């Protein structure tokens, strides 16, 4: 959680705790689908899917959730005692692509990815989308378990969602919280004065280190990437909606 004063409606990010930087760049939205790069997109119609109990959803998704450990350069410029941060990410495919938030890896000097098996492996940032606060990390590791990404075009206010991530980089595996989709198409102002659009609002508890982790539905499919919380309220968290990410992820994978 980013500390400091915030104006109303300006949520802090819920991941890396040191000097997040947001930039506004124009991006090229690739028309390619995620499936062209091997990312698991699933049927669009909920009627063709089977709702799972929450424990089954967790068992399905947890192997695809990673911890993102970073080391950055302090403001003084010296690398001695460089602050470390942590967040979460989600495995996109067996080729080692990991999706996370850009503010977790902005300005860092090294990235290490912790898998659900407990294995730590070096990662490198291969692409970024500054507008959506997304970044793509690549690792080399065997037996990766990609997450399934929902292809549903409509989410319903009130439907159950589950946030999975690694708050505080706690040992023993990822943390799970459950809530509902509270609202759709939210726009929020970042502490740096930029605006994120088309966000999902949820009351699933999001904590420091959850940034970059998935928000999933009762089918065990990713419907969003956790990105921010409202500092002046309780139980208001935000996630980037999957429909807003489809083309940017494909574009980043093509570049990375």
Which positions does each model-derived feature cover?
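Gly/Ser-enriched beta-turn/beta-hairpin loop segments
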Residues: 74-84, 126-132, 170-173, 184-200, ...
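N-terminal secretory signal peptides that target proteins for export/translocation
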Residues: 1-17
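Bacterial N-terminal signal peptides
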Residues: 23-36
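Conserved hydrophobic positions within beta-strands
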Residues: 89-91, 123-125, 181, 226
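Catalytic nucleophile loop of clan PA
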Residues: 90-91, 205-225
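Conserved active-site neighborhood of the chymotrypsin/trypsin-like protease fold
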Residues: 45-48, 73, 93-171, 234, ...
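N-terminal activation segment of mature serine protease catalytic domains
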Residues: 37-78, 88, 97, 110, ...
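C-terminal cap/linker of serine protease catalytic domains
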Residues: 49-58, 165-169, 183, 218, ...
């Amino acid at each position: 959680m980013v500390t400091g004063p915030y104006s109303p409606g300006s949520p802090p990010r819920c991941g890396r705790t040191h000097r997040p930087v947001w930039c506004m760049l124009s991006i090229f939205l690739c028309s390619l689908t995620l499936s062209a790069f091997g990312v698991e997109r699933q049927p669009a119609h909920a009627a063709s899917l089977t709702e799972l109990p929450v424990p089954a959803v967790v068992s399905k998704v947890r192997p695809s959730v990673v911890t993102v450990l970073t080391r950055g350069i302090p403001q003084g410029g010296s690398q001695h005692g460089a602050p470390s941060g942590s967040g979460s990410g989600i495995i996109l495919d067996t080729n080692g692509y990991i999706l996370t938030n850009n503010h977790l890896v902005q300005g860092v000097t090294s990235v290490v990815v912790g898998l659900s098996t407990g294995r730590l492996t070096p990662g490198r940032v291969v692409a970024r989308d500054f507008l959506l606060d997304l970044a793509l990390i690549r690792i080399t590791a065997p037996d990766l378990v990609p997450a399934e990404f929902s292809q549903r075009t409509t989410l319903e206010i009130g439907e159950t969602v589950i946030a999975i991530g690694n708050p505080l980089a706690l040992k023993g595996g990822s943390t799970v919280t459950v809530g509902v989709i509270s609202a759709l198409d939210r726009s929020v102002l970042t502490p740096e004065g930029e605006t994120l659009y088309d966000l999902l609002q949820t009351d699933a508890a999001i904590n420091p280190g959850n940034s970059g982790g998935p928000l999933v539905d009762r089918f065990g499919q990713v419907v969003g990437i956790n990105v921010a919380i409202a500092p002046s309220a309780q139980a208001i968290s935000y996630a980037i909606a999957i429909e807003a990410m489809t083309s940017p992820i494909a574009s980043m994978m093509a570049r990375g």
